[in-house]
Every structure is written in structure tokens, then in C-alpha cells.
Amino acid sequence: MTSLPVTDPAFAADATVEVDDASVWFGQKVALSELACSFGPGVTGLLGPNGAGKSTLMRAVTGLIGVNTGHVRVEGRDPRRDRDVQARIALVPEDEAVPAQLTARELVRYVADLHGVRDPDASERALALVDMLPAADRRLRGFSKGMRQRAKVAAALVTDPPVLVLDEPLNGADPVQRVRLTELFRKLGAEGRTVIVSSHVLSEVERLADRVLVLIHGRLAAAGGHRAIRDAMDDRPRHVLIRADEPRRLGAALLRLGTVAGVSLTDAGLVVTTERAGDLAGAVAPVARELGVRLREVRPLDDSLESLFRELVR
């Protein structure tokens, strides 16, 4: 596993959820290993391959399981033991286990009654937030996977939770609903709620999350904004695509710079490898101008969560 510095230790004064050296194991399997991280207001994306410990962490945060060592605190209290703090956390699980005989409206009202929500309009507001009112009286057994996900999100929101934990909430949603749910989650985070979202669709997390935590083998591999994490990897090669009228001439000139480790000509254009991306960015245009070469595009190839994630799990 690639070892990276944690660029944002995340133990700010406004942290709502704190995980302090928490370990969880099931028999001989270690699911979390001395994990230390925290979550505050806004949206945090939780990334990692299968078996990384994401769902275990979410279950510990919501109090569904305890930790074997260390501590998990939500608003300074133990979510496993404190019923008051449990009521302030809502979970949308990844699994599709829903009472299929209920309608969406009945599901949301059931959750509202279970939590003692007395506002008679709360269920309608929650259904409206996820665009479920037109289908609210249809039974869940007839819903698509994406519609069931939206019904579960509505059920979670009916309690107006300060802490919202979402395990793959966009799974099965159509493109329009993905956009709407993404906007909703960002709005909830902007309101000051702590929103924790796991997803395997890294490009969606990139659009959704203010911060990213990457778990590998139950440990925290990286934390912070994805660009900040990439900046912390400045001792590792980065790749920049340059499209120009005369790529061979430009590549030869760039190779003479101390900022470039290598160049290769591909169908997409000239790919430059560098460990000093900032210096390269400042040098490309002057070199092209001196050569009389027209630049058409200069774009980093590895400045996305997808490429970052691949490098982290190598």
C-alpha cells in the first residue's frame, strides 16, 4: 500500500463526529485498525475499495456496533449507549432491505412515528425533498432500485437529523436524480449538518464532497480535499497532457528543462511526466511561444479522485 501523509487530521474544534484510535475486528478479520479521523459540518466523502472498512466505520458512527478499542463520539457522546444522540443521527444503509408491502409514504410516516416526530407535515416535506410525492402511494415492491434509495433518504430526513450517514445513496439513481440528490446533500451540508457519504463512483464524490477520507485496509490513507492530497504527493510523478501543433519539437524542448522527467507521444497528445508540476505549468507557454508552437490544451491527467484512488491502493 502506498503510504501518504494525512494532509488534514480533521480534529478541528467544530468536529461533530470524532473517531479516536478506533479498532474493530470480527473474529480474525480486522475491519478498522487504530483509525483516527473526524467529521464536521459539510459533506465528507468516504472512499475505499471493498473491505476497506467504510461500512464498518459508518455502523460505528451510528451506534449500530461498538468498537473493540478506542472511542467514537458524536457531539461528545457515545452513539452506542446514548439514546439521545442516537436520535440525532440518521443512516441510509446500502442494502435494499425495505418493507416491500409499504408505500413510500407509509415508510416515511413509520420512521417519523418511531422517532416521535409530531409535525404532521414532516413526512410530506421529506418526500418532496427527494421528488417522491408523485409516487408516494406506490408500494416499495414496485420501485426501481433508485426509487427505493430515494425513499430511504426521505425516511432518514424525516427526523431532521444533524448528522446524516449515507452509504452509497446514489446507487441505482438515474442521471437526473443523481444531480438532484447531489444538490440536496450539498444543501444539507451547507445548512451546517454533518453529512458523511460513501460511494464507489469517485467522480460523483468529487462533485459532492467538501473533504475526502480514503480508507485502505481499515486505516486512514489520506484526508482532505482531493487536490490537497495530490499536492502532498509532490515527490511522486504527475502526468500532464499537452496538445500542440508540433508536439515532437515541444517535447524535445521540454525535456531540456530540469522540471521534466520524461515525455511520450500518444494519440491524445504529448504526455509529460514531472515531479514539479507547478514549475512545469509556468514553463510550457514560454517554451511554446519561443518555438512558435501553438498550444491547444494543457491538462493534468491525474488531478481527479479516480487517479488519486488508483495510486492510493497500489
Model regions and ranges:
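ABC-family P-loop ATPase nucleotide-binding domain
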Residues: 1-23, 314
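Residue-level "edge-of-site" marker
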Residues: 125, 140, 267-268, 301
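Short, flexible cytosolic linker that couples an ABC transmembrane/permease module to its adjacent nucleotide-binding
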Residues: 2-9, 125, 225-231
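Short alpha-helical
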Residues: 80, 118, 203, 248-249, ...
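ABC transporter nucleotide-binding domain
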Residues: 182-274
